[in-house]
């Protein structure tokens, strides 16, 4: 059974380019092996991530993320059964979220992933994918 999981977390320290590159490389390798797809949204001091795949694989990965010492304030926003993947083209992709981004300010001036609905979070992700160029690591 396929599921789509959406969570938000904060890094323990500052997000660096080196950290992001390492996350993308490790995620892409692991996700390809486990047939997981998804996207990572980074910015404003947080990570917002979607994972798609077989329930057991996604649950195991989410458990690893929750116990990862690089994450804090990990919060599950949604998990749902799906019939098809939304992000099937990427084992992992990256988009940037910035509260200084005019598109984000105009469309969602008060966006806070910890308070937002999953629907609003997916709308933001869709807009970021359409208006930006996801950094792919497949």
What is each model feature region?
Residues 1-138:
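Charge-rich, low-complexity N-terminal segments
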């Amino acid at each position: 059974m396929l599921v789509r999981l959406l969570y938000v977390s904060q890094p323990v320290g500052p997000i660096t380019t080196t950290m992001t590159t390492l996350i993308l490389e490790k995620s892409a390798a692991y996700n390809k092996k486990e047939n997981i797809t998804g996207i990572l949204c980074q910015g404003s001091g947080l990570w917002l991530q979607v994972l798609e795949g077989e329930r057991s694989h996604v649950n195991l990965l989410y458990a690893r993320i929750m116990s990862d010492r690089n994450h804090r304030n990990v919060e599950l926003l949604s998990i749902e059964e799906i019939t098809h993947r939304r992000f099937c083209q990427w084992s992992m992709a990256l988009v940037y979220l910035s509260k200084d981004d005019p598109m984000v300010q105009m469309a969602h001036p008060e966006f806070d992933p910890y308070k937002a609905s999953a629907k609003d979070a997916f709308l933001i992700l869709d807009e970021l994918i359409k208006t930006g160029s996801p950094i792919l690591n497949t």
